[in-house]
Curated annotation (Swiss-Prot):
PANTHER family: BLR3025 PROTEIN-RELATED, CELL DIVISION INHIBITOR SULA. The record marks H169 as: Essential for degradation by Lon protease. Component of the SOS system and an inhibitor of cell division. Accumulation of SulA causes rapid cessation of cell division and the appearance of long, non-septate filaments. In the presence of GTP, binds a polymerization-competent form of FtsZ in a 1:1 ratio, thus inhibiting FtsZ polymerization and therefore preventing it from participating in the assembly of the Z ring. This mechanism prevents the premature segregation of damaged DNA to daughter cells during cell division. Residues 106-112 are annotated as: FtsZ binding. Residues 1-22 are annotated as: Disordered. Is rapidly cleaved and degraded by the Lon protease once DNA damage is repaired. The keyword Cell cycle applies. It comes from Enterobacter sp. (strain 638). This is Cell division inhibitor SulA. Residues 162-169 are annotated as: Lon protease binding. Interacts with FtsZ. It comes from the Bacteria. Belongs to the SulA family.
Amino acid sequence: MHTSIYANRSTSFSPSAGNDTQNTFGRVSTGMISEVVYREDQPLMTQLLLLPLLQQLGQQSRWQLWLTPKQKLSREWVQSAGLPLAKVMQISQIAPCHTVDSMIRALRTGNYSVVIGWLSEELTEDEHFRLVEAAEEGNAIGLIMRPVNPDSLGRGHLSGLKIHSNLYH
């Protein structure tokens, strides 16, 4: 499993940041975007990584939004995973071409502690920038879930944990 976390990137150079200058310099945003590249044949690893975070976020008064392409969340799984059933919303059958825009709209609202979306392709720089901006604006976490084919793992370095953060660089 490979994760990339992009946190607290400054938006002070963006064209739309003019009105947010005070926020950019006056406080540290807690909004962030994280990408989890995982093997579908190893769901336990993904659950071990994400469930503690989702359980902690479930203690907030805000919702958790799951934008899933195919599968529907099982009520039994949500409850057995320790997630608050009353705070979990799901939109299933969402077309992959609409996932990023849907995540951006949801993150901006501030109604969700976390927005989880599945993508089959890597984000473009523009998509990533817009997601980070939206997460910071809504003080939320966006999780990009990207399944990888186990056969393609031999071609690149995707088996390690990689965390990008300005706290360490």
